[in-house]
Amino acid sequence: MGAIAGIMEAQYNELRKHGHSPSEAFNETVEEFTQSLIKLAAEKGMDWLYANCSTTAQRGALDWKGKFREAVAPLFSELYQRVKDGTEAKIVLEKNSQPDYRQKLDAELACMRNSEMWQAGEKVRDLRPENWKKEA
């Protein structure tokens, strides 16, 4: 989840830096991924997705896939080693054993929930047809 959220936040922040509105930036990051790309990849496979998208998206995906892989490979290597050597388990046990664990966790989650990106997301999700209120 951290990798996915981190990538989404990075793209969102880049779009905002270049003048995109919060809702537009959210649509171009989270909505496109969760409402389209990941569902099609799960149903049909990444090879199908590559073969059936626009030529612009296709070319960009092919040209940038390797760069993204190389950018995150060291992070996955570090994470794997930290899981393997017990560092991550130790952190979890230490954090979860603190008497104020729940308050600290709630503060971390509130920071995310109250960020501009996820506040925009709440508004955008309300616009999805499945979330429209039914009239009596």
Predicted regions and their residues:
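A short glycine-threonine-serine/GTX helix/turn-capping micro-motif
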Residues: M1-G2
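NAD(P)-dependent Rossmann-like dehydrogenase/reductase catalytic/cofactor-binding core
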Residues: E9-Y12, K17-A136
